């Protein structure tokens, strides 16, 4: 009888786990893919998508300031799914789901089923703001870089744990794909020596390190070869050095910075994930460090510390998407911490507390789920249909308080931001304080308010004149 009861308990437990996985898969599919084609196309995304399409057709002159691999994949996706941003977006979201699978398999083996499930849930469902409803629903380089780095570190850990030789070269190939998607993860290369060090596998450290380095180098060269590796790398280094020296305008905590403060990417992290999720992640990481820290915790903390140091100290700029490089390691550590909390005594209490923290994070994801549900073209994406309905089919459009990358792909050469380019058929005003309105435009909108129809399109305002906006001999703007 006891054995039969035990079998029924195991069967019930298996059923609960299957249901949990199915529910997570459905929620992840929704969060990652629902209305994925309806997001506005950002400037960087448009650049990478166009460059990828050019690369697979043999033209490598675009976007040489970044490595090519992610753009190769974007180009291949367009060959399969059609030209444009949708197919690359589907690819990026698929990599997010694959990353969740890697996390689940990794932590399920090392900590337990629910730790793996928690990592996958935190990775696929929680907010990551910075571009669109979630920054890994658009075709940016960062999510591709992150996936390959995550898979590479999982592979080298598995090689160390199992001794199966083929995991080692696979890890090197995956890491080469990460570095040649975006170079930031180059700082993680020392971590690949850490795994055999942690297990005191000295022979594997020496022999495996040499094999890994050779495979990594050969793969990097092969991936860069179509671009011309020497010229491409030199151009990339010169560009990145110039950007670090000259800075990059960013609005952080309400202030415009040319050179970001060291905490800039931390601020974007807090804004991107939201307070409830941030608290849960911080608690989970703290628990991982405090409750039975082991080799796995050290191995996961190493890439987090290296990337935080790079983005907080070495890099002089901060952008809303940069923190995404840290998030897989934060998520993994948090899941480890919550998983180990759940098995402390008294288990009913600690298990309930761990479950409560996971629920808080999932509840904190509801705004992202709502944003995904409500995703549609907005702002500048709706501008040209509005102007056509007003009878404006050509002519220049003046843009102020809005970054050029937001409108270039929608209006092309019609979009200008210099009053010397008058006449204009309309004025579009955004909210980006990095690009303030010229005084001439401010004066025109104040003094000749009655000459304009004012239409709000989400976060922009379109001023449609009852004539044409021209510049007179005194440099003033008038509606004529």
What are these regions (language model features)?
Residues 10-15, 108-109, 163-164, 200-210, ...:
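Membrane-interface helix-loop-helix junctions at transmembrane boundaries of multi-pass membrane enzymes
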Residues 22, 26, 86, 90-111, ...:
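Transmembrane-helix motifs of polytopic, lipid-linked glycan transferases
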Residues 23-27, 173-175, 213-214, 280-283, ...:
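Transmembrane alpha-helix segments characteristic
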Residues 110, 150-167, 178, 197, ...:
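Membrane-interface transmembrane helices that cradle and orient dolichyl/undecaprenyl
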Residues 136, 142-145, 187, 274-275, ...:
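Hydrophobic/aromatic-rich transmembrane helices and adjacent perimembrane loops
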Residues 189-290:
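Transmembrane-lumen/periplasm boundary regions of multi-pass, lipid-linked membrane glycan transferases
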Residues 337, 351-377:
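Transmembrane alpha-helical segments
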């Amino acid at each position: 009888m006891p054995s039969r009861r035990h079998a029924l308990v195991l069967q019930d437990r298996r059923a609960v786990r299957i249901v949990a996985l199915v529910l997570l898969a459905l929620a992840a599919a929704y969060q990652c893919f629902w209305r994925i084609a309806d997001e506005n196309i950002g400037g960087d995304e448009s650049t990478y998508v166009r460059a990828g399409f050019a690369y697979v057709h043999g033209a490598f002159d675009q976007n040489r300031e970044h490595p090519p691999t992610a753009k190769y994949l974007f180009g291949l996706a367009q060959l399969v799914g059609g030209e444009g941003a949708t197919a690359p977006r589907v690819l990026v979201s698929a990599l997010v789901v694959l990353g969740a699978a890697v996390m689940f398999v990794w932590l399920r083996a090392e900590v337990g089923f629910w730790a793996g499930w928690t990592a996958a849930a935190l990775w696929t469902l929680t907010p990551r703001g910075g571009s669109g409803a979630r920054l890994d629903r658009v075709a940016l380089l960062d999510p591709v870089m992150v996936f390959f780095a995550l898979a590479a570190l999982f592979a080298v850990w598995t090689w160390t744990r199992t001794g199966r030789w083929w995991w080692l070269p696979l890890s090197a190939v995956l890491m080469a794909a990460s570095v040649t998607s975006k170079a930031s993860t180059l700082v993680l290369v020392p971590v690949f020596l850490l795994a055999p060090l942690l297990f005191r596998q000295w022979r594997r450290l020496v022999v495996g390190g040499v094999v890994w380095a050779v495979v990594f180098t050969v793969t990097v060269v092969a991936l860069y070869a179509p671009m011309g590796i020497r010229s491409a790398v030199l151009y990339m280094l010169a560009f990145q050095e110039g950007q670090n020296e000259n800075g990059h305008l960013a609005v952080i905590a309400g202030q415009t910075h040319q050179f970001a403060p060291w905490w800039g990417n931390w601020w974007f992290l807090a804004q991107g994930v939201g307070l409830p999720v941030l608290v849960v992640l911080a608690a989970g990481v703290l628990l991982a460090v405090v409750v039975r820290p082991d080799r796995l915790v050290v191995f996961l903390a190493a890439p987090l510390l290296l990337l935080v140091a790079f983005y907080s100290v070495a890099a002089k700029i901060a952008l809303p998407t940069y923190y995404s490089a840290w998030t897989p390691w934060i998520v993994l550590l948090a899941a480890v911490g919550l998983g180990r909390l759940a098995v402390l005594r008294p288990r009913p209490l600690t298990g309930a507390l761990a479950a409560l923290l996971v629920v808080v994070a999932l509840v904190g994801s509801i705004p992202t789920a709502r944003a995904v549900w409500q995703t549609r073209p907005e702002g500048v994406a709706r501008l040209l249909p509005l102007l056509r309905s007003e009878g404006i089919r050509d002519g220049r459009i003046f843009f102020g308080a809005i970054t050029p990358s937001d409108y270039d792909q929608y209006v092309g050469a019609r979009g200008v931001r210099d009053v010397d380019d008058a006449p204009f058929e309309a004025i579009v005003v955004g909210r980006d304080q990095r690009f303030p309105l010229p005084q001439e435009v401010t004066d025109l909108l104040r003094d000749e308010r009655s000459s304009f129809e004012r239409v709000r399109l989400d976060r922009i305002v379109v001023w449609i004149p009852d004539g044409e906006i021209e510049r007179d001999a005194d440099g003033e703007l008038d509606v004529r």
